[in-house]
């Protein structure tokens, strides 16, 4: 993936070739400027590659128009961000229904789905609260519910615990672990080793290339124990 900054071409990713199978749990790591965010944007269909192909669930999405990419994002991918990205004037329930509105789900059905999903993430008693009435961990749970409500096959989590304390971070990672056990592919970007160790596979980027790609032995030990 290349970007033009003034008269300079910046090669954000170079000759990156990775294959992520259905129901994998993958952590993407690397220092600032390594290409983590660029790779996440490509995987999430928020951007398209300058060259090469991206096959998502059997479909080449690398040359698709924006409208098609938006439809794929809505149906196939759930996003969880470090800053939650909740609408401040909307309640938890209203925030979670948004992807269903874009998908054209009837009102009664989308409210029922949103309520069910909020219960699933442990916020059944906070549905009418707005973001400023919730703790950081509760806001991230709302964001996770919003990511899950359309039943996507892939969850992309970009520094999901970056704004949380250590105990709340463990709670949120426990929820992502459960989501993976329930059959979702989970891909998370993190700079924290303890967060990455929740994943079965770790991909380390350096200067826009895949520096390491390996099975996480600590995850294997956790599963065995």
Located regions from the model:
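ABC family nucleotide-binding domain
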Residues: 1-205
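Conserved beta-strand-loop-alpha-helix hinge in the C-terminal portion
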Residues: 209-225
């Amino acid at each position: 993936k290349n970007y033009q900054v003034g008269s300079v071409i910046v090669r954000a990713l170079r000759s990156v070739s990775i294959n992520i199978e259905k129901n994998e749990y993958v952590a993407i790591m690397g220092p600032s400027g390594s290409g983590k965010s660029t790779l996440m944007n490509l995987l999430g269909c928020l951007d398209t590659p300058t060259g090469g192909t991206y096959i998502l669930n059997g479909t080449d999405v690398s040359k698709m128009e924006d409208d098609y990419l938006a439809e794929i994002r809505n149906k196939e991918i759930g996003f969880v961000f470090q800053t939650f990205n909740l609408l401040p004037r909307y309640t938890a329930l209203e925030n979670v229904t948004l992807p269903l509105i874009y998908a054209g789900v009837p009102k009664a059905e989308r409210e029922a789905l949103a309520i069910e999903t909020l219960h699933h993430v442990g916020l059944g008693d906070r549905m009418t609260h707005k973001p400023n009435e919730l703790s950081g961990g509760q806001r991230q749970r709302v964001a996770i519910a919003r990511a899950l409500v359309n039943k996507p096959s892939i969850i992309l989590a970009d520094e999901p615990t970056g704004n949380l304390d250590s105990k709340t971070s463990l709670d949120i990672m426990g929820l992502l672990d459960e989501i993976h056990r329930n059959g979702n592919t989970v891909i998370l970007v993190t700079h924290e080793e303890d967060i990455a160790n929740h994943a079965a596979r770790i991909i380390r980027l350096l200067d826009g290339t895949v520096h390491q790609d390996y099975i996480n032995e600590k995850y294997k030990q956790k599963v065995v124990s």
